[in-house]
């Protein structure tokens, strides 16, 4: 495959010196872009868009044509695995994802297959291969999956939920049953992510969107333990380079030390956690990614610049920071405001890396 021309993201996730802080956005390929909305209308459905490698490739590349980003992230959905398990995924207007066959019993769990990522999920790995070819080494490609706990909430509830009542009832009444489901989903997720890496993904993110809904000890038992298992079993080198893994638990600020001990390379932070305090807590064990409040992008470009400056100052000098939002970019955000954020990172972050760049230059000299 092509030689990587911009490796800032991979270097930052390994806490190596960079000339400026790398930047990308969660959901950077999505509804806030008019070109995405046009292609989505042509495709006719979200599943057609995500399930067609050529279309998924085009959507993945769209934000890179607009913005000087330091990474591409695969356009897909976290629910591809339960869909491949036969749960019958549909997206309903105004309601979101719905499963026709939710998992509610021991028999349901027993009959769940572990999908072959090069069979039932071949459209994803084909998209990864196509994107890598089209990127031609410009920036690294991030692959991803949902955490087992987050996927289980959808599989048990049958869709989105505000209180996770069925899932939490199983957690408290039948914990062993939930563990059996999580074990199977973790197996499937590990195979799926390793297939993405084999196809060309150069970094991996695990999105634990609903881990923050768990009680303190329940998070460790029912979410973090399974993410740690996945991290331990992932392929960690491809194309002669380390493949970094980032864990992101929304609302996960209280568990940062435990998350850093999983063997991952980086932690994604939402906007409720102070970046500088997080850095003090985890030390140099992991890189940190984040964590601008996505709603800042509704504000003026001047305010956006000031808030970018605050996030950069919170982290402080030195390597190990990837600038990102604290969650996905909202559909109503003006694209120019995303551009203002990216420009501000480019302009304001080099000063935080000057000493490291000088030291690296002296070492190489």
Swiss-Prot record:
* EC number from the UniProt entry: 4.1.1.37
Tell me, which GO biological process terms does this entry list? Answer: protoporphyrinogen IX biosynthetic process from glutamate
Q: Which PROSITE patterns match?
A: UROD_1 (PS00906), UROD_2 (PS00907)
**Cell compartment(s), UniProt:** Cytoplasm
The pathway to which it is assigned is: Porphyrin-containing compound metabolism; protoporphyrin-IX biosynthesis; coproporphyrinogen-III from 5-aminolevulinate: step 4/4
Q: Which reaction does it catalyse?
A: uroporphyrinogen III + 4 H(+) = coproporphyrinogen III + 4 CO2
Keyword terms: Cytoplasm, Decarboxylase, Lyase, Porphyrin biosynthesis
Which residues span the membrane? none
Write down the Pfam families for this protein, in alphabetical order. URO-D
Which of the seven top EC classes does this enzyme belong to? lyase
Top-rank taxon, per record? Bacteria
Site feature Transition state stabilizer, where: 77
The residues that the entry says bind substrate are 27-31, 77, 154, 209, 327
Give the CC-aspect GO terms. Answer: cytosol
Q: Which molecular-function annotation in GO is an example for this chain?
A: uroporphyrinogen decarboxylase activity
Q: Does the keyword Cytoplasm apply?
A: yes
Q: What family does the database annotate?
A: Belongs to the uroporphyrinogen decarboxylase family.
Quaternary structure note: Homodimer.
Physiological role: Catalyzes the decarboxylation of four acetate groups of uroporphyrinogen-III to yield coproporphyrinogen-III.
Q: Which PANTHER family would you find in this protein's record?
A: METHYLTETRAHYDROFOLATE:HOMOCYSTEINE METHYLTRANSFERASE RELATED, UROPORPHYRINOGEN DECARBOXYLASE
Q: What's this protein's name? A: Uroporphyrinogen decarboxylase
**Per the UniProt entry, what species is this protein from, by scientific name?**
Alkalilimnicola ehrlichii (strain ATCC BAA-1101 / DSM 17681 / MLHE-1)
Q: Write the lineage as a comma-separated list.
A: Bacteria, Pseudomonadati, Pseudomonadota, Gammaproteobacteria, Chromatiales
